[in-house]
Amino acid sequence: LGRYSVDQPLYPRSGSNVSMSLQFTAPYSLFGNKDYENMASSDKFKWIEYHKYRFTAEWYQRIKGNLILKLASKHGYLAYYNAKLQSPFERFQVGGDGLSGFTIYGRDIIAQRGYEIYSNNDGATIFNKYQAELRYPFSLNPSSTIYGLAFFEAGNAWDNFKSFNPFQLRRSV
């Protein structure tokens, strides 16, 4: 579900991009009486089950001329139908530059400049990321759009709501 009102895809000057995605799998563990605590991992994760929620909001505003302010907020939450079946797949990894453009081992990589991708090796089930950028174009040629930017990012990932602290953020400038 989303709303996209950005004026240009390569160098947005105004508009917003707001989206929410939901992913659900069937709750296989509810269909049988199995002892998941003593089960081998290969049997336990034969059928992965989870429900995953992501929210992204980006706003673009022209300050003066081609100087643009971008504000963004991203959030994610991964939950399980059965607490004994917390899969190592589909988790969130916060860090890296975001240039890889793909998911490794069923994990969503949430780019945050200045931090390594695997600073949280097991992945996390909750993440928040906030971003502010000032952008100025050097070339608006559609075949080679080039712009400089100054940015501020803050974000983190947590394993559960007990450890979740929205004010404990890793920052980069």
Regions found by a protein language model. Give the residues of each.
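C-terminal transmembrane beta-barrel domains of outer membrane proteins
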Residues: 14-173
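Extracytoplasmic assembly/pore-lining segments of large envelope/extracellular complexes
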Residues: 10-12
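Intrinsically disordered, low-complexity linker/loop segments enriched in Gly/Pro
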Residues: 5-6, 15
